Protein backbone atom coordinates (compact mmCIF):
# COMPACT_ATOMS: atom_id res chain seq x y z
CA UNK A 1 0.00 0.00 0.00
CA UNK A 2 2.82 2.41 0.82
CA UNK A 3 4.41 1.94 -2.62
CA UNK A 4 1.09 2.64 -4.34
CA UNK A 5 0.55 5.84 -2.35
CA UNK A 6 4.13 6.92 -3.02
CA UNK A 7 3.70 6.34 -6.76
CA UNK A 8 0.47 8.33 -6.85
CA UNK A 9 2.13 11.20 -4.98
CA UNK A 10 4.99 11.19 -7.51
CA UNK A 11 2.49 11.30 -10.39
CA UNK A 12 0.30 14.03 -8.86
CA UNK A 13 2.31 17.06 -10.11
CA UNK A 14 2.01 15.74 -13.68
CA UNK A 15 -1.73 15.04 -13.48
CA UNK A 16 -3.83 17.33 -15.65
CA UNK A 17 -6.97 15.26 -15.80
CA UNK A 18 -10.49 14.98 -14.73
CA UNK A 19 -12.56 13.14 -12.23
CA UNK A 20 -11.28 9.55 -12.61
CA UNK A 21 -7.48 9.37 -12.60
CA UNK A 22 -7.25 5.59 -12.31
CA UNK A 23 -8.64 2.64 -14.20
CA UNK A 24 -8.22 -1.11 -13.67
CA UNK A 25 -8.74 -3.61 -16.46
CA UNK A 26 -7.53 -7.19 -16.98
CA UNK A 27 -5.30 -7.13 -13.88
CA UNK A 28 -3.62 -3.87 -14.89
CA UNK A 29 -3.92 -0.58 -13.00
CA UNK A 30 -3.66 2.56 -15.09
CA UNK A 31 -3.04 6.12 -13.91
CA UNK A 32 -4.22 8.30 -16.78
CA UNK A 33 -3.89 11.92 -17.84
CA UNK A 34 -0.36 12.48 -16.59
CA UNK A 35 1.97 14.50 -18.81
CA UNK A 36 4.83 12.07 -19.34
CA UNK A 37 6.64 14.47 -21.68
CA UNK A 38 7.34 16.81 -18.73
CA UNK A 39 8.86 14.09 -16.55
CA UNK A 40 12.55 13.86 -15.88
CA UNK A 41 14.07 10.42 -16.35
CA UNK A 42 14.74 10.21 -12.59
CA UNK A 43 10.96 10.29 -11.99
CA UNK A 44 10.46 7.46 -14.48
CA UNK A 45 13.18 5.41 -12.77
CA UNK A 46 11.59 5.92 -9.35
CA UNK A 47 8.18 4.89 -10.68
CA UNK A 48 9.82 1.85 -12.28
CA UNK A 49 11.16 0.82 -8.87
CA UNK A 50 7.62 1.08 -7.52
CA UNK A 51 6.20 -1.16 -10.26
CA UNK A 52 4.89 1.41 -12.75
CA UNK A 53 5.76 1.73 -16.44
CA UNK A 54 4.96 4.62 -18.79
CA UNK A 55 2.32 4.40 -21.49
CA UNK A 56 -0.68 2.17 -21.93
CA UNK A 57 1.06 -1.18 -22.24
CA UNK A 58 0.11 -2.92 -25.47
CA UNK A 59 -1.02 0.33 -27.09
CA UNK A 60 2.48 1.81 -26.77
CA UNK A 61 4.50 -1.39 -27.20
CA UNK A 62 5.23 -0.85 -30.91
CA UNK A 63 6.37 2.73 -30.32
CA UNK A 64 8.74 1.65 -27.56
CA UNK A 65 9.92 -1.38 -29.55
CA UNK A 66 10.65 0.80 -32.59
CA UNK A 67 12.59 3.37 -30.59
CA UNK A 68 14.40 1.19 -28.05
CA UNK A 69 14.32 -2.33 -29.46
CA UNK A 70 12.35 -5.43 -28.66
CA UNK A 71 14.57 -6.50 -25.75
CA UNK A 72 13.88 -3.27 -23.87
CA UNK A 73 10.18 -3.26 -24.79
CA UNK A 74 9.80 -6.80 -23.47
CA UNK A 75 11.84 -6.21 -20.30
CA UNK A 76 10.08 -3.06 -19.12
CA UNK A 77 13.27 -2.14 -17.26
CA UNK A 78 12.31 1.45 -16.45
CA UNK A 79 14.35 1.40 -13.24
CA UNK A 80 17.44 1.65 -15.44
CA UNK A 81 16.21 3.68 -18.41
CA UNK A 82 18.79 6.18 -19.66
CA UNK A 83 18.24 9.85 -20.46
CA UNK A 84 18.70 9.08 -24.15
CA UNK A 85 16.17 6.25 -24.10
CA UNK A 86 13.58 8.37 -22.29
CA UNK A 87 14.08 11.27 -24.70
CA UNK A 88 13.34 8.92 -27.62
CA UNK A 89 9.91 7.86 -26.36
CA UNK A 90 8.50 10.45 -23.95
CA UNK A 91 6.78 12.54 -26.62
CA UNK A 92 5.35 9.57 -28.51
CA UNK A 93 3.71 7.43 -25.83
CA UNK A 94 0.34 7.79 -24.13
CA UNK A 95 -0.02 10.11 -21.14
CA UNK A 96 -0.38 7.33 -18.60
CA UNK A 97 1.47 4.90 -16.37
CA UNK A 98 0.44 1.32 -15.70
CA UNK A 99 1.22 -1.42 -13.22
CA UNK A 100 0.71 -5.16 -13.16
CA UNK A 101 1.76 -5.12 -9.50
CA UNK A 102 -1.22 -3.11 -8.27
CA UNK A 103 -3.76 -4.27 -10.83
CA UNK A 104 -3.89 -7.94 -9.87
CA UNK A 105 -4.34 -10.01 -6.76
Model segments located where?
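Acidic interaction surfaces
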Residues: 1-105
